[in-house]
Amino acid sequence: MADKITREEKTIATLDLVLRVVVDAGNWDVFSKRLVRYTREQYGIELPEDIGDLPDTSEVSKVLLSHLGEDKAVLSAYRIAELTQPSEMDRAKVTEGGLAVLNASRDESEAQNPSNPEPESIESDAVEDLGVAAESDPSDDEPDPEPEYDHREADHDSDADSGYYSADGGRPGTPVDEEPQDDSPSSEETASTVIEEAQTSASNDSHDDDTHRDDGSASEEDLERDALVAPADPFPNLRKCFERQAMMLTGALKDAADTADPPETLSVDSVQRQLERFVFNPDRRVPAEHLEVRYNFYPPFLTPKAIASYHIFAVTASIPLSCKANRSGSDLLAKAKESTFFKRLPKWRLGIEIDDGLGTEVTAVTELEEAKMVPLKDDVSRLQWAKMRGEHIRFFSYPSLHMPPKISRMLMETLLQPFADENQKAEEALPCLSDEEVLAIVDPTGRLHGEDALKAVEKRRAAVTMAVRYTATLELMERVFREPSMVKKMQEVLHHTFHHGFVALVRETAKVNLSNYATFHGLTYNNPLNNCIMSKLLEGADKEDYVVDSIYLFLVLTWQTAMGMWQQAIDDMTIQMYTEVFTKNKYRLYSLPNPTAIGKAIVDILMDYDRLTEEMRKALPNFTCQSQITAFRHFLLERSNIPAVAAPFMPSDFVPLAYKQSPPLLWDQVYLLQLAFYLTKHGGYLWEAPEEEANNPSNRTYCPCNLCSPHRMPGHNAALHNEILAIGTFEIRSPDGKTFKLTPELWTNAYLDKFDAEDFHPFTVFHYPENASRFASTLKACVTQSPEILSLIRQIQESREEFLLTKGKGVYKDPNTGETISRQPRDTARAQHAGDGQALPAPGAYTTGGNRAETAPAGAVRLAPDYQDGQFPIAKVGPHYHGPKNVRREDQGYRGGPGGVRGEREVVLSRRAGGRRFGRRNTRQSGYNERANRYFGRGGGGSVRGQQGEHPTTSPSASEPPAPSRILARGTPPSPERRDRQEE
């Protein structure tokens, strides 16, 4: 590459390239006027009016750069140049033969009038992608496909500019033989023929020959109209996508030219790396309006390296036979599943015996000597199938959990031995402390000699090495995770991840799904494509394995995020300061007796005791959705050459369950797996309701963990239950005009903040159902802390309902069920003028007769009976009314069918069909019986007239159906004798 140039020179070169293209196209005057107007309207910046009169394009570039700045100048020039260039549809009007002739004539003219050639730059490709024709090198063999803009016609009302093309690729009505032949007499003649044919076709289609010009050139007014009436583009979205991608590449390559030192060669890898950096780590100086479009153009489901700085690394190691998948049915696995307390790290010592074999606790089905995944007698179906298809698996890519590489290298070079220089292979680096210095630390009195002294020195070096490589990382893990606030935050995040407990209750109450939100480095994202109920679709061992593996991967992501944050915060000055501190303290570290003490001392120095650890806890963990964990699981299996579709393994299947059964390289994996088992039990994610209560709706959101029970569960907290019932049912107004209303949003915010530290047990599994007597805190609501307020509100609501049901007029329905809870009004006026719209009741109707209420709700699932003053409603017959209208009970069925929705539809149809018959009933007087009508709801013709005659003898008490339950209790209907006395 050429010498590095400044950013300003790069911008001027880009602008000059665009301006030269405009000059060559002959549109400079239009371009300059549009550019001045565009900058005035878009940015409020006045450019010099004489900018189009400047002699050189480089001078114009400098003026644009000084007035607009780098980004605005380039974007404005690109946009105006694109508007003044021929569109894709106009380019398509000229056939391939005409294009070749035009290109030949252009090359000939360029040979006669050579211009100053521009050196090839990375911007030229980007400008061509934007649709702006860049200067072509005369030595290029490929012709330029863009026609001269001066030859395009000005008629935009014809089909030539409409963007419509026939199925064979040409315009409708254009003969195929119009295409010029290759044996044309001359280039100029053929070019004019092509242009004339295009103009003739356009004029014939639009019947407007006055708009064509003989010289084939476009005036300034035509160009102005081109911008206002643009031809339809058959692929506008694709073209816009290419333009925006070209803008991204231009910006990325400009940044590369400014930041790369030394300059990188132009290759696919370098462009991809710079594009990822430009997309996911944008420059803060870039205007905000150009940032959001970047994320639309990264390949879907492709893991970007720029933001996965730590998560993509893995440690490929041999799978131990003692892994979790080979411990089915063992006591060790059963104890891990029943973990009831947060274990502390063991006391590390040298000479630990590691037994990572299959052991005698499990029974193998086959005798495969080389297989790592051994089929066992007690394997679940998932492992049976996976091991059968995964006999070839020997290694697994365990996710990387080590400290930041800069820290690890500094510790090794400061406390153990500097790395050898590759250029000086003959010289071996000396250890940080010589044998004499270590012996003086181990045996200050000088009692050890010979081999004993050498063994003591080697033992102390081994202890320091073990602490640097293994135990320091484990000690740091324990400090980050084993803290009450961290356990609380992890359980809250996992409740969101699995849509469990209080998160599910929020969705039931406020209709808000909080499980789709994810956070990363302080930014919140919404993932509506997430499936938050994946864990609830499994049962038994499959659900347990899935939940444990998901929590294990969540802990891995959390730890990797913490180490990535630390890695980004480390610079050369920090490493230098760490080196100085460890150099001063290396004698003290070597004087400590065991790896546990040495590891704690190293972490004390690195974390400044707990200051840096506290900062990590503040930023972690991130809210994680199940789709992220699923993608991470698939990524790890894919890195290990394990096709999940054939062998359904999980990453936690390859991790041992105990430190003594694991090689030291996997001790950090063992720690996170043990913590995953504990969090699974502590969070109650595997809780299931008893069989006799499986259908209880309250069990869908129940969780026994300390975060939920008893304070956040309405089944235990009566005050919370009453508050949930009062949401949106009242509004309180103060004398000064302020109002208070318990809305779902207000309740949700208070509910999420509800937490009682006294009843939270972070390091032990202490669930409320088994230990209810040991929870002493008062159970309160979220918003209204006084239960008397809720009781008063409930009483007011009940008294209001009582008043409406007894004294009010109209139809009152339950807002939740649609059930009619009041007596329906009688429309006596309509009964007096009943005509063809009325009908006899259905033959199978209520035996006391009468029609069903016309205003009965059509969508009610259950219907309530009508009472009035403790009695069944009795029809009041007017002087001209023969047959009751509203006496029928709403819960009565029809013709062998139950009451409800179906009965209502049938009665409407019967009224329409029997309207004439009802009109005939109004003229009959002989069948009228006043007492029968009062007590039995009958008219001249009964409801069962075809079966029992006009006056059935069935008593009303024998045909009364049982009354369904009501919201408010009512009195018992009196007997017929008592009603007789009341009437008399």
UniProtKB/Swiss-Prot annotation:
The keyword DNA-binding does not apply. Might be cleaved by the viral protease. Residues 945-958 have a biased composition (Low complexity). Protein that inhibits host translation while promoting late viral translation by ribosome shunting. Blocks host cap-dependent translation by binding to eIF4G, displacing MKNK1 from cap initiation complexes and preventing EIF4E phosphorylation. Binds to the tripartite leader sequence of viral late mRNAs and recruits host eIF4G, PABPC1/poly-A binding protein and 40S ribosomes subunits on viral mRNAs, allowing ribosome shunting and efficient translation of late viral mRNAs even though conventional translation via ribosome scanning from the cap has been shut off in the host cell. GO terms for biological process: intracellular transport of viral protein in host cell; symbiont-mediated suppression of host gene expression; symbiont-mediated suppression of host translation initiation; viral translational shunt. This is Shutoff protein. The gene is L4. InterPro entries: L4 (IPR003381). The modification Phosphotyrosine is found at residue 812. The lineage of its organism: Viruses, Varidnaviria, Bamfordvirae, Preplasmiviricota, Tectiliviricetes. Residues 190-202 have a biased composition (Polar residues). HAMAP family: ADV_SHUT. GO terms for molecular function: RNA binding. Belongs to the adenoviridae shutoff protein family. All late proteins expressed from the major late promoter are produced by alternative splicing and alternative polyadenylation of the same gene giving rise to non-overlapping ORFs. A leader sequence is present in the N-terminus of all these mRNAs and is recognized by the viral shutoff protein to provide expression although conventional translation via ribosome scanning from the cap has been shut off in the host cell. Monomer. Interacts with hexon protein; this interaction allows chaperoning and trimerization of hexon proteins. Interacts (via N-terminus) with host initiation factor EIF4G (via C-terminus). Interacts (via RRM domain) with viral mRNAs that contain the tripartite leader; this interaction allows ribosome shunting and expression of viral late mRNAs. Its main location: host cell. Residues 411-476 are annotated as: Binding to host EIF4G. GO terms for cellular component: host cell; host cell cytoplasm. Induction: Expressed in the late phase of the viral replicative cycle. Residues 148-159, 205-216 have a biased composition (Basic and acidic residues). The keyword RNA-binding applies. Residues 479-597 form the RRM domain. Residues 131-231, 810-853, 876-984 are annotated as: Disordered. It is found in: Host cytoplasm. Residues 913-923 have a biased composition (Basic residues). Keywords: Chaperone, Eukaryotic host gene expression shutoff by virus, Eukaryotic host translation shutoff by virus, Host cytoplasm, Host gene expression shutoff by virus, Host-virus interaction, Inhibition of eukaryotic host translation factors by virus, Late protein, Methylation, Phosphoprotein, RNA-binding, Translational shunt, Transport. Residues 137-147, 176-186 have a biased composition (Acidic residues).
